[in-house]
Regions:
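C-terminal secondary-structure termini that scaffold catalytic or DNA-interacting sites
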Residues: 222-236, 241-282, 294, 405-426
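Basic, Lys/Arg- and aromatic-enriched nucleic-acid-binding interface segment
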Residues: 126, 133-137, 141, 156, ...
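N-terminal core-binding DNA-recognition domain of tyrosine site-specific recombinases/integrases
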Residues: 2-3, 17, 70-157, 175, ...
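Short, polar N-cap/turn motifs at the start of nucleic acid-interacting alpha helices
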Residues: 222-231, 350-351, 370-393, 420
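Catalytic-site neighborhood detector that most strongly recognizes the C-terminal catalytic loop/helix
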Residues: 172, 180, 231-234, 241-245, ...
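Active-site/catalytic core of tyrosine-dependent DNA strand-transfer enzymes
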Residues: 17, 265-275, 279-349
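C-terminal catalytic core of tyrosine-transesterase DNA break-rejoin enzymes
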Residues: 156, 203, 207, 214, ...
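N-terminal DNA-binding module of tyrosine recombinases/phage integrases
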Residues: 7-112, 303-317, 397
Length: 426
């Protein structure tokens, strides 16, 4: 007997068969329509009833990944994650090992595949020029994580008896030092910035530890900057959504998952849509308290928006956004990025990306709070505290110098002679 299971935009025929060794296996076959799935189900049942069922040919990596994306990816991933995984498969996996039968895979072959990827040129994705000419160990690690999970699913579905990359060795990745501004540089950038949008973005990103999409997705109903709140230091913003541009096919494939609002297109055509969506994790939904200075900036921005609304009337596209164009349309990340690059170029500032302000924020909040990881995690929205400690527990040079000085003062200056020691027994 076979059964049909509906999976989002596909239909899976699930059945069991016995191989030539007499061992029973389960198999999933994916089809785009219910009619095709029913046709295949009837064929399987007819052949099994008449003892003419042919044992399925060995599946290839490409066929497995189709099922993996349809059954696992569609149900588990956010739109940006689905798109990123799909790019890895189409650009770096299928062209090289896509046609290899699963039964032929072994750990040695997969380790050689990972080494060969170091010689593969990086692809241009979404019109973005890659940072490196060839694939880096960090990108190969992403490929490995995807394949490890896909092969685990294959074992679960009984397509494979073992995972060939479970213990595979991958190219060693050198830790990459994050480029970020120290506090004096950040303060200098604020003084030099004469772009109102960028100035507010810099202040919010640093003081509230925000991701770009979270900041651009802030709506006025998620802000409390009343005079009373500002005065007693409890003004806040509530992060519950983010602005993101996603591919239309992924948007439809995932059935608009996590999407709160779809912005109307300015121009006809196009293969992307701009949306407000749920943040990446539940812990990303959070209340972040504003410093008084920043709260006053936000309050002034709200007043400016109200004046523009009254001036333009019906010509203003009111989406209730804190960051918007002069006509109310959403402000996308590239506008802030271009303004930041101009500020850096015009004033010979250290070259950093906008996301680095989040790293700077976390670093200094850890420093100022004496390492209060939970408090910093509350602002950053990281899912686990260890994500903060692993990525941001580095100490600024000035603190390291101070630590050495403290050791000198507390230990060696109080021990005038190394021969005059007291032994403490515990």
């Amino acid at each position: 007997m076979a059964s049909i299971i509906k999976r989002k935009n596909s239909y899976c025929v699930v059945y069991r068969y016995t191989d030539e060794k007499g061992e029973s296996h389960q198999r999933w076959e994916s089809f785009p329509t219910n009619a095709e799935a029913r046709k295949r189900k009837n064929q399987i049942e007819y052949e099994q009833d008449n003892n003419v069922f042919t044992v399925p040919e060995a599946r290839t990596v490409r066929e497995l990944l189709v099922d993996y994306m349809e059954i696992y990816g569609v149900n588990k991933w956010a739109m940006s994650t689905y798109d990123a995984k799909n790019s890895l498969i189409n650009n770096y996996i299928n062209p090289i090992i896509g046609d290899i039968p699963l039964s032929d895979l072994n750990p040695r072959m997969m380790e050689k595949f990972y080494l060969d990827l170091l010689k593969v040129k990086s692809k241009v994705i979404n019109n973005r020029k890659p940072e490196h000419e060839y694939l880096t160990p960090s990108r190969i690690r992403e490929v490995h994580k995807l394949l490890r999970n896909a092969f685990n699913q294959a074992v679960k579905w009984e397509f494979m008896t073992r995972n060939p990359v479970e213990h595979a060795t991958i190219p060693k990745e050198k830790p990459k030092k994050r480029a970020m501004w120290d506090l004096p540089t950040f303060k200098k950038a604020l003084e030099l910035c004469d772009d109102d949008d960028l100035s507010l973005a810099l202040n919010l990103a640093f003081s509230c530890t925000l991701r770009m999409g979270e900041m651009l997705g802030i709506t006025l109903d998620c802000i409390d900057v009343s005079e009373e709140k500002i005065e007693n230091g409890t003004a806040f913003i509530f992060i519950e959504k983010e602005l993101q541009r996603v591919k239309r096919d992924v948007f439809e494939k995932l059935n608009k998952r996590d999407v709160i609002f779809v912005f109307p297109r300015c121009l006809s055509g196009g293969n992307t849509v701009l949306v407000l969506k749920e943040p990446k994790t539940e812990t990303s939904k959070r209340r972040v308290y504003l410093p008084k200075t920043v709260a006053k900036m936000v309050l002034q921005r709200i007043k400016d928006i109200q004046e523009i609304k009254e001036l333009l009337g019906d010509e203003y596209h009111d989406y209730n956004l804190l960051f918007s164009s002069s006509t109310g349309r959403p402000m996308e990340g590239q506008i802030i990025t271009r303004a930041l690059k101009k500020l850096i170029r015009d004033n010979n500032l250290p070259d950093v990306c906008f996301h680095s302000l989040r790293h700077s924020s976390i670093t200094y909040k850890l420093k100022w709070s004496g390492g209060d990881i939970k408090a910093v995690q509350g602002d950053s929205g990281h899912a686990r505290a260890d994500m903060v400690t692993e990525q941001y527990s580095h100490i600024l040079d000035e603190d390291r110098v101070a630590n050495a000085r403290r050791v000198d003062e507390q230990v060696y200056n109080q021990c005038p002679s190394k021969h005059n020691l007291t032994v403490i027994t515990v």
